[in-house]
């Protein structure tokens, strides 16, 4: 996955803006893409506040040591979820790394919704998926 995304980053950043999403794995993508080249002015990394606040991840320092791109984060407010499984993310029990933060940031930028409304939609979808057969 890392070589593939690094290659995509090299090409895509020449023609459009790119938000890398995938938590700490994207630091590895940046490191590899640095050798192939990419347009730093069109790249940002998007993640959740859980990854930013994870002292074991050390994402901000890692990214800074590789590239001078912006790192954006979103607090999905999962601690306020109706569902214990989602609340586990906010305590650090569950780790993501699937692009959740970048996806949430893109959704907020595209629709203009806030994190409270986003949580309502997340809870609604979680309920739908967890109760469907």
Regions found by a protein language model. Give the residues of each.
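N-terminal loops that bind phosphate or other acidic moieties
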Residues: 1-133
């Amino acid at each position: 996955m890392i070589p593939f995304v690094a290659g995509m980053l090299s090409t895509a950043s020449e023609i459009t803006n790119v938000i890398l999403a995938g938590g700490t794995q994207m630091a590895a993508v940046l490191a590899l893409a640095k050798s192939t080249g990419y347009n730093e002015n069109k790249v940002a990394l998007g993640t959740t506040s859980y990854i930013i606040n994870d002292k074991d991840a050390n994402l901000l320092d890692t990214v800074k040591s590789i590239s001078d791109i912006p790192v954006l984060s979103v607090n999905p407010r999962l601690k306020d979820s109706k569902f214990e499984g989602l609340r586990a993310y906010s305590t650090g029990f569950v780790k993501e790394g699937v692009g959740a933060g970048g996806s949430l940031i893109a959704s907020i930028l595209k629709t203009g919704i806030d994190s409270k409304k986003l949580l309502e939609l997340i809870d609604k979808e979680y309920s739908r998926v967890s109760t469907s057969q």
